[in-house]
């Protein structure tokens, strides 16, 4: 058993809690980046490159027929092989949270395409389900079981938002435990069936699950409803006859309780549980070995790694299984090390015999990576079957927006008091994010419509008529730089015309003499 710190390299700033690792043979892929994918790597999936204690993430390539896979935090991930104990050929990915905190309900299947030009490509497809379709959730588990020559996927646990008919402005963003149902999914026909077992009374999430033959073992986890970590092992046995499947559950008292732990496999029948939490404020620093056979399970405490001072004093930690007995986990950087580019320290804990640095390699040789030329900004990035369009070192971390600055919960003005935990919908068009409007001052910036005291009528008028908007701080500046309108000159009455005398018609001498004689 070895524990060593690794040096963060390119793109490691995209690593965040809730990520997942997919290991195909000797290749490990990272899923669940921070924020939405950028143009430099639109796939959002990276190859984990660990050499000489340097950790790097290199953009992965997908085939042309792949569907889009969003970055997902805390999804249920499980490997799938065509035969029991065979080589991993597929990964199943269900649920998880997107960067917008929306919870996914989709099921994806990830496979490794044949290598072309010494590079590996991935293929992602979406699987439609029918029957008792599981609701959108995260923090749950999936496992593949084999029975009577057939296989099925067992899904259990997780959290989700409250049903729409129960959500109000006060609890709009609150999550609850999903119902303690066991879902049995037939991948061949896309059918899903739910089972309500009396041994499972409370919802459970962030637990550990292991599968052997036709049995799934569920350890630990956290029940949000009663804030409880049960010290039980739930043994779920699946029978797949020609007719309807049968599912049963047995409760075993293990006397250990934890949540958010990581499990890694060291041999076909041996596993190690490491990390996690014993309570909301207490990390779990001990390790347990799990030994499985056909009918029994044995859990023992094993040797604990020599944790560093940073790990012991850190309040939080997170990680994922790298495969073959290795675990990658990180802890937040304290205030003394804020000068570093990365927000986390990363460690590799290895319970196996092989060095994970030798297991994980990058796409292509080291010489190809160092000598490769970066793509120009004008070039378009596409999904390519040949795997030549992406260069591993072209991802620019500066392109990654800081969610604290560009998200919906920014401080848009001095009087802004938007808080993710206390915000309530104000406009009829809002759902789970506040409405924002773009201010056109200089380069432009986003502000909250509610902070600008905009009425819903005015907000609709501005958006429908495509009118430039200036926020309260910049509206006076915007008026000052506007070109003055041309006004016609004021028409002034001439003083000469005012003083002009009226015209007097003078009579001729003939008319005067005629009028004189007439009146005489």
From Swiss-Prot:
One of the record's GO cellular component terms: nucleus
Record-level Gene Ontology MF annotations: chromatin binding; histone H3K4me3 reader activity; phosphatidylinositol binding; phosphatidylinositol-3,4,5-trisphosphate binding; phosphatidylinositol-3,4-bisphosphate binding; phosphatidylinositol-3,5-bisphosphate binding; phosphatidylinositol-4,5-bisphosphate binding; sequence-specific DNA binding
Gene3D superfamilies for this protein: Kelch-type beta propeller (2.120.10.80), Rag2 PHD finger (3.30.160.290)
Tissue-wise expression: Expressed within the thymus, liver and spleen in juvenile frogs, and within the thymus and bone marrow of adults. A lower level expression is seen in the ovaries.
Keywords recorded for this protein, A-Z: Chromatin regulator, DNA recombination, Metal-binding, Nucleus, Zinc, Zinc-finger
Signal peptide: none
UniProt superkingdom: Eukaryota
Zn finger region (PHD-type): 415-477
Major location (coarse): nucleus
Cell compartment(s), UniProt: Nucleus
Binding residue positions for Zn(2+) 1: 412, 416, 448, 451
Keyword Chloroplast: no
UniProt record, GO biological process: B cell differentiation; T cell differentiation in thymus; V(D)J recombination
Binding positions (Zn(2+) 2): 439, 445, 471, 474
Family: Belongs to the RAG2 family.
Comment, domains: The atypical PHD-type zinc finger recognizes and binds histone H3 trimethylated on 'Lys-4' (H3K4me3). The atypical PHD-type zinc finger also binds various phosphoinositides.
Stated role: Core component of the RAG complex, a multiprotein complex that mediates the DNA cleavage phase during V(D)J recombination. V(D)J recombination assembles a diverse repertoire of immunoglobulin and T-cell receptor genes in developing B and T lymphocytes through rearrangement of different V (variable), in some cases D (diversity), and J (joining) gene segments.
Subunit comment: Component of the RAG complex composed of core components rag1 and rag2.
Protein name in UniProt: V(D)J recombination-activating protein 2
Taxonomic source organism: Xenopus laevis (African clawed frog)
